[in-house]
Each structure stands twice: as structure tokens, then as C-alpha cells.
């Protein structure tokens, strides 16, 4: 019998196994400090994530894997995080293949698309966990502001606006004008 999200809400402390038993129902789930968090996303969020994942995949598919928000990463803290888009170098995967289980550690690049309802404390807690677990870079995408914030492990941030081009030393050939990322999205 499948475990429902409703049933899990009644428990006090959840485990990785509880998270694995959740149905694939279109929601994004994370295990954070023993609690399961559900974060449904809207169409604009999904469109930006899919567009960014496609652009990244076209650039890195020969030497890295690109994942969507349904992929769980096991942080050093024990939390399971699911970035909206992530890139992981194949050399970090056994045989260069994705495991059937959650992936140990953070992706090399984690991308979070930020909704207006997300609290800054939650956003920066995630940011810290990604870097503590091995991320090389984190991008926070703010669709309503039409901005991207590119963070490095030293927590230096580069704030980019609609007229700017998103680039990273992690992906030397990757360039994404933010105008293209946001062009179809109406607010």
C-alpha cells in the first residue's frame, strides 16, 4: 500500500524511507530536519525550470547530468534537498550513471527558482546546506524581479538583471541572456 502525504503528516519525525514511499503526484517534497515539506509549483515556475534545464542539458550532456526537481540529494546534515534544476559532473557518479537512490552530496550546481512566498531564512538555509554538502555554485532565480543571483562557496554573490547574461566558470561555454529566460513569462 502506498504511503500518502496525508498519512505522513501525522507522524512526528520522518525518515528517508518515508520520503521514498511518497507517491509521484507532481509535488516537490524535501526531508528537512525530520519533517517532510511539500512545495507545489506553479506553471511559470515549471516553465522557467524546464527552459533552464533544457539549455543546461544542451551544453553539458557529454560530461555532466542535469536533473529536475524530482531528484533528491542527500545533504551532509541528513536532509534530502531537491533543487529545481541541478547539474552533477559524471565523474562524481559511479560508472558515470545516475543511482536508483538519492544522490549523496549536493550537485555541483544547484538552481532554486524562488517564489514570493518563500522566506529568506529558508532560502539561505538551503544555500548553506548546498555549499556544506559540496556544491560549487548556487543560482537563485527570482522570476518576479527578473533577476538571477549567482553564489559561490565563499557566499560572494553576483546579482544579474534582465539585460545581463548568466555565465559561470563551471560551464565555460554556457551563456544565457536573462531576457531569454524570462521572455515568455508574464507578471
Language-model regions, residue ranges each:
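Gly/Pro/Ser/Thr-rich low-complexity, intrinsically disordered segments predominantly at protein N-termini
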Residues: 1-187
